[in-house]
Amino acid sequence: MNKAGQEARGFFIVLSAASGTGKTSIRRIFLERCPEVQFSVSYTTRTARPGEVDGQDYFFVTETDFRERIDQGEFAEWEENYGRYYGTSGKVMTRVLEQGRDMILDIEPRGAKTLKKNYQGGIYVFVLPPSLAELKARLRKRGESEAEIRKRLDKVREEIAEARGYDYVIFNDSLEKAVERLQVIYQAEKSRASRMSKQIQGVLDSE
């Protein structure tokens, strides 16, 4: 892609984390502060949680519907997680990026790996808990059983190991600080010289 095409096209941030790390809260506050960024609404077969809105938090669909979308090649990535399916629409993603808008995607490490193979130019950010002990306490507060917590922690260890393959790592030791760190990453990526050739030329022509 030439410089003009790279500058005109938006870029996307992939935000991943282990379960219970606070990724959703970070993403929501980030979007409030950076309204120019569009959230990629995923499809899922899980039921909506209290307060979630169809088409805003997720597109809630049946497993039959989801499988039909897989067969039609609609997803840029999809995965099964705890018996439920999640997927990102490739068509929507391509359209938004070609319009020059930036996006943020909230997906798990396995889905991020698939996306990385299929789409270039993404910025991959992994959110870490301060410690596994802190994460265990958060899961207990959510009312999960000890057996479920042990099961989740086994998977969490596998997910956290994937952080080494990401571009950036954010510790969620404080929600406010975590959001600020994500904002800094976004602004730094926006300021890359490869995305600023129009502004550079504007200064050169400003005499």
Swiss-Prot record:
It catalyses: GMP + ATP = GDP + ADP. Its main location: cytoplasm. Pfam families: Guanylate_kin. The keyword Transferase applies. It comes from the Bacteria. ATP binds at residues 17-24. InterPro entries: GK/Ca_channel_bsu, Guanylate_kin-like_dom, Guanylate_kinase, Guanylate_kinase_CS, P-loop_NTPase. GO terms for cellular component: cytosol. NCBIfam families: guanyl_kin (TIGR03263). Belongs to the guanylate kinase family. This is Guanylate kinase. It comes from Syntrophus aciditrophicus (strain SB).
